[in-house]
Design a protein with these regions (language model features):
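Conserved N-terminal structural module of periplasmic/extracytoplasmic solute-binding proteins
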Residues: 6, 18-117, 344, 363-367, ...
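Hydrophobic core
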Residues: 9, 13-17
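Hinge/lid segment of periplasmic solute-binding proteins
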Residues: 25-44, 87-93, 113-164, 195
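Extracytoplasmic/periplasmic solute-binding protein
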Residues: 45-48, 108-111, 147-159, 164-166, ...
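Short, solvent-exposed loop/beta-turn-alpha elements that line the ligand-binding surface or hinge
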Residues: 132-137, 187-189, 237-258, 320-327
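Glycine-centered hinge/linker elements that transmit conformational signals in sensory
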Residues: 198-202, 238-276
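Extracytoplasmic/periplasmic substrate-recognition and gating elements
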Residues: 304-371
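Long, aromatic- and glycine/proline-rich binding clefts that accommodate carbohydrate-like moieties
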Residues: 329, 351-419, 450-459
Length: 477
């Protein structure tokens, strides 16, 4: 694979030094030219919250091949393409709202927002309908952005960025007499389940010095990843989406409740005790924890917490009893066309964005994405786990309302250990239903805030009355 990749890159770089004026000079990996698409020298901005607009001074072969392709796009379609930051991660919707409210079409823009902020975009009609080339993009994201049969945004390609997964420390498993290859085998034959993972976690826990305290722990990680991970791995969700596109609170469903009950058991029986949510970043490098439920970037980026142990592997979240396949809770960034352009201009922007997101190197070698990952871990983590999760993910419905730190986190998952799971789900109901009501258009945020203020005032008055009544009661003799 790597040899083929090198040949493709070399060919593209040679061609990149030449003019593409003649049709026969166009590399066969490049997409077919769209006749009549011409921007007349205009600049098209692809706005996000992280791009600098600059190219690498010393690009890799893959980067140079990408730059050559973008240069060809600019020459072919008479356009300047600039991918650059417009606002902060949590401010992109406000930037988009400002553009749409002012009907500002003075610049040609495609605007990106984090998947967790798409609710207001959809509810307020901030993106135009996207009709072009949907087959080129991740289907789950297209489905997520489809309301009433119309799609309003796409992501950056066909694949998911893998999220929740299970990392394991090979040495800890080996010291416990476990062959870590068995875990990959279980994943491969479909037997990697909650129960299977529990059997390994039971086997690794150890009190080495017989002082009554564990020295080797089974599990760590951001506990919220564990909560969300077990819910999605049991085919659960916190909201259901009706055929009409309405959200209905569903944390009390059998699948979700089973997952919440199970993660409570795991917290009590397997998680290394912690005080702060990010204590796992200190625990894992100590080399005394077998498993870490985290997000893929924590290992596969090469410079995060998982990389602090010498040898690690990675498998998908184990399946719950209601699941037929492995998955993770995906959160793809979404790009759309601000609802300020006429239909012809919107279509042109959809076309150039679709072309821009193609990568002839990746298209020529479908495994090119994996090249750098082999330096980090074993082949099975790359070829069996990461490769699978790139193509299999679940976009959970709370993303229509906001990211998990503004929706399910403060209202339910962060406090899930505060009592029985069913009680926590019921305690969160009013707040979670209010958020859905705003998204559904049944209430305004102002109405929700006013009702909340009334409830709080009534509760305060009742508490004050109870205190006064207690103070007036005669003291017991």
């Amino acid at each position: 694979m790597k040899k083929i990749m090198a040949l493709v890159l070399a060919a593209l770089m040679v061609l990149g030094c030449c003019s593409f004026a003649a049709a026969e000079d166009i590399p066969e990996e490049y997409p077919e030219i769209i006749e009549g698409l011409d921007f007349g020298g205009a600049t098209v901005y692809i706005n996000d919250w992280y791009s600098s607009g600059e190219r690498a001074e010393e690009p890799t072969e893959e980067q140079q091949a990408q730059y050559d392709y973008w240069d060809w796009l600019e020459e072919t379609y008479n356009v300047k393409l600039v991918e650059i930051k417009l606002g902060d991660w949590d401010g992109m919707v406000a930037e988009l709202q400002n553009i749409v409210s002012n009907k500002d079409n003075s610049e040609l823009r495609i605007i990106g927002v984090s998947g967790g902020f798409c609710g207001p975009v959809l509810a307020n009609g901030l993106f135009s309908e996207w009709t072009y080339g949907l087959e080129n993009f991740n289907k789950a994201t297209v489905d997520f952005m489809t309301i009433g049969g119309k799609c309003y945004g796409v992501c950056g390609g066909k694949f998911f960025e893998p999220r929740q997964c299970v990392f394991f420390n090979k040495k800890v498993l080996e010291d416990a007499g476990i062959k870590w290859e068995e875990i990959y085998d279980a994943q491969a034959d479909g037997s990697w389940t909650w129960e299977k993972m529990e059997s390994y976690m039971d086997a690794v826990k150890a009190d080495k010095d017989n002082d009554g305290e564990l020295d080797i722990f089974a599990l760590t990680g951001n506990f919220d990843d564990g909560v969300v991970g077990l819910v999605v791995s049991n085919n659960g969700d916190f909201y259901e989406k009706t055929e009409e596109g309405k959200l209905v609170y569903s944390a009390d469903s059998d699948n979700t409740l089973a997952a919440l009950n199970r993660i409570q058991e795991w917290n009590r029986n397997y998680y290394r005790p912690y005080v702060n949510w990010d204590d796992y970043k200190q625990f894992w490098p100590e080399g005394n924890v077998a498993f870490l439920i985290g997000q893929s970037y924590e290992g596969f980026n090469g410079n995060d917490v998982v990389n602090n142990v010498e040898e690690w592997g990675c498998v998908c979240l184990p399946k719950g009893p209601a699941a037929d396949a492995y998955t993770s809770a995906a959160d793809n960034n979404v790009f759309g066309i601000p609802a300020v352009y006429d239909e012809e201009t919107s279509l042109k922007l959809q076309q150039i964005y679709t072309l821009y997101r193609k990568n002839p190197v990746i298209d020529a070698d479908e495994d090119a994405w994996a090249t750098r990952l082999y330096e980090l871990t074993d082949e099975r983590a790359v070829e069996e786990t990461y490769a699978y999760l790139r193509e299999n993910g679940t976009i959970m419905n709370f993303n229509y309302i906001g990211d998990r730190n503004s929706t399910i986190g403060p209202n339910l998952t962060w406090g899930i250990m505060g009592g029985a799971a069913s009680e926590q789900v019921e305690a969160a109901r009013l707040a979670m239903e209010d958020m859905a009501a705003v998204f559904n258009g049944d209430k305004t945020q102002e109405q929700v805030d006013a009702e909340k203020a009334e409830r709080e005032a009534a509760a305060a008055a009742a508490a004050e009355a109870a205190a006064e009544e207690a103070a007036e009661e005669p003291a017991a003799e």
